[in-house]
Amino acid sequence: MLVSYKWLKELVDIDVTPAALAEKMSTTGIEVEGIEVPAEGLSKLVVGHVLSCEDVPETHLHLCQVDTGDETPRQIVCGAPNVKAGIKVIVAVPGARIADNYKIKKGKIRGMESLGMICSLQELGLSDSIIPKEFSDGIQILPEEAVPGDAIFKYLDLDDHIIELSITPNRADALSMRGVAHEVAAIYGKSVSFPQKNLQESDKATSEAIEVAIASDKVLTYASRVVENVKVKPSPQWLQNLLMNAGIRPINNVVDVTNYVLLYFGQPMHAFDYDKFEDHKIVARAARQGESLVTLDGEKRDLTTEDLVITVADKPVALAGVMGGQATEIDGNSQTVVLEAAVFDGKSIRKTSGRLNLRSESSSRFEKGVNYATVLEALDFAAAMLQELAEGQVLSGHVQAGQLPTEPVEVSTSLDYVNVRLGTELTFADIQRIFNQLGFGLTGDETRFTVAVPRRRWDISIPADLVEEIARIYGYDKLPTTLPEAGGTAAELTPTQALRRKVRGLAEGLGLTEIISYALTTPEKAIEFAVAPSHLTELMWPMSVERSALRQNMVSGMLDTVAYNVARKQSNLALYEIGKIFEQEVNPKEDLPNEVNHFAFAICGLVAQKDFQTQAQAVDFYHAKGILDTLFANLNLKVQYVPTKDLANMHPGRTALILLDEQVIGFVGQVHPGTAKAYSIPETYVAELDMAALEAALPSDQTFVEITKFPAMTRDVALLLDREVSHQTIVTAIESAGVKRLTKIKLFDVYEGATIQAGQKSMAYSLTFQNPNDNLTDEEVAKYMEKITKSLTEQVGAEVR
C-alpha cells in the first residue's frame, strides 16, 4: 500500500516528519517498507510555456521557443510528437538533473542550438505503467494555470513523500487511506477529518433505469447507482497526481473516480457504460462451464463454475471482483454510467485471480476483506465525484441486492485479563483512553467491560484481539521485560524424540532424503490421501488459497515436492518426511485440532541405474514395501498388509492398508495414475504411517536373544493356487500351522504361463527352520512341512507341486 503523506495530512492533523511517522507506525504494528520522494535527485525542472513550434524539414524534430520565466524565451529542439505552441511543459534547463542522475547541458542538434530539454514523465523516472496513455509516447502537458519559471514539483506532486506499507492479512483495513488515517489518529491521539460530498440527485429514480439481483451465495451484497449525461475527459491534474503516486495509471475522469474511491475507502468499484447494456437487469452469479469473457486488458478468459461473473441479458460483462469486461467499458462516447459497489467472497476471488494469474487492486482487497459499513457510502461518494468532475446527473437512490451487518461487533473482557497477559498494571482509565483513541465504544467497568468494535476493524473478534490493540497503542516499548523462567530438564530423549531419531536414521540408511513441506495446503489437498478424513481446519485470513487449510495427510505435500523436482529434470527421487498432521474431530471454530506425528515417503524413477553389468531397475510396490519391512523389523513390530481399493487417490490394485494389532496405522502403494497426471509426476509409490500408533505399540523392554550356535535348515515349497490369492494370505496360512521352529518365510518365485491353468498361478517359498537349543533332524522338519502343507491346503486351497 502506497500512502501519500500530503493526502494523509489532509485526513489527520499531524505535525511529524514522514520518517518519524514511519518509525512510529512500524513500532505499533504496521511495517513500513520505505519512504520515497519522486522528486529526489531531480533539480532545475521548471514550467515552460511553448510560444512557438516549427517543424524541422525532413526530420521528426521541432524548433520551439519556450518561456521559462526568464527575460527572453529559450530555444529548445524537441522530438516529441505532441509538442505544439500554447501548451505548458516540463523544461530541464542547462545544469538540471533528471532520471539516472543525467545532467542536461547546452547543445546543438542538427546545427540548431538547444538550451534545455522538454521532458516526458519517463525522463523524470516515472514508470511507463503509471503514465497516462496520452502522454506515454510524448511529453507531459501541464495544467493551464502553471506559471512559467515555477518549479514543476508542486504541479505534479513530485515533492510528496510516498510511504510504502507492508500490510499483513489481518490488517487489511489499512489498505485504504481512511484506514491508515484511523491508525495514525489512534497512534497520536488525534481525530480524523474526512471530507463530505454534497450529492445532488435528480427526480428520476435509479430503480427506473436499472435492476440488480444476486444468484450466488458468494455474492454478499451488490449495489448500483446510475449517473447520466457524464462528460468523459481527462481527470484534473491533482487526481492524476494522486493516482500515479499510488501506482495507478490515470485513464479518464470516470475510471479515475472509481480508483480514487478504491484508495480512499478501500472499496473496489467498477463503472459500466449503461448504453452498451443489452438489458437493464444486472445479475451477479456463478459462471457456467464453457462461458468466456474478454476482459479490459483484451484477453479472452475461459471461465469455470468456480468464477463469479456480473451478467446483463445473461451474458458476462465483468469478472466479479477482478476485472471488468471490454464490451461495457467506459470510453470517450460514454454518457450514462452504472456504478457498482459490492462485496464478494474473498476465497472465490482468490481462486479466480490465482487461476487466471490476474491480480488487481480490487481482487487484493476482496481477498483480504472490505469494510461492510462503508459500501453504500463509497458508492454515494463516487456518484458525487462524477457529478463534480464529469458534470453528471445522479439518479436518486440506489438499487441493492443482499444486506450486510454494519453494526459494531461487541467483544467483552476484564481489566485483570488484560494486565495478566501484558504484565502491566493498567487502570480502567488507561483502557478508556486507549479505546477512545482507537475510536471504539466502551461500556462497563474494570470487572467487566464491553468494546464496540467498528466494522472497519474486522480483524478484532475475541478478547485476545483487544489485548493486542491495547498493547499496540499503549506502546510495546512500555511493557515490562522479564527473563524467561525455565527449570532444568533431564538430559535424555522422550519416547517420541527417540522414535523420531531412530526412524530418521533408518530412512536415511535406506537412501531416503529428508524434506520439510508446508503444513498448510489447499482444502482439497488437505484430505486427499487421508485414510479417515475429519473436519477441515481452515485459516480465517490466509495469505493465499494454496496455504489456507491444515493438512490431514503428508503425501500430498510430498507429491508437490516430487512435481517440483520432476519439472526440473530430477526424476529419480527417494524422499521422506516426519511431521504433524491435524485431525479435527469437533467443530474447528470451537476447539483446536489434534496434532499427530506421521512418517511418509515417496519414491519414483529408477532404484538402480543401467551400467555394464545390470539393467536399469524402476521402483515398484515391493521397493516401497521393503522400506517398511526394514523399518518394522528394526522397531521389532509385526504388521499386516491388507489390499484395499478404498483410497480414491491410490492405485486400486497396488495399494495396501497397514495393520498393527488389527488397527489401521497407514498405507503403502502406487499413486493413482489419474492423480499422478494431475500432479504432473511419473509412476510414484508412497507410504504414510501414524507414528503415535507406532510409539504406543513399541515393546517397553528389549529382550536380548542369544545367537544360536545350531544351524538352520531350509525347505522349498511350490504351490499351485488361484490367481486372486495374495502373498499375505499365504503367509498367514503358513503361520497358522503353529510351527514354533519356523523362523523365516521368503517368496522367491511367482509364475503364470502356458504350463499353468488359466486363472491360477504358481508361487514358490523358501521356509527356514531353526532350534536355538539343539540340532534339527530331517524327520522333525518333515513333520513341520506336513503341518504347513495341510494348513495351506485347508485354508487357501493350495496344491503342492
UniProtKB/Swiss-Prot annotation:
Its EC number is 6.1.1.20. It catalyses: tRNA(Phe) + L-phenylalanine + ATP = L-phenylalanyl-tRNA(Phe) + AMP + diphosphate + H(+). Residues 708-801 form the FDX-ACB domain. It is found in: Cytoplasm. Binds 2 magnesium ions per tetramer. One of its GO terms (cellular component) is phenylalanine-tRNA ligase complex. Its main location: cytoplasm. Residues 39-153 form the tRNA-binding domain. Its cofactor is Mg(2+). Belongs to the phenylalanyl-tRNA synthetase beta subunit family. Type 1 subfamily. Tetramer of two alpha and two beta subunits. This is Phenylalanine--tRNA ligase beta subunit.
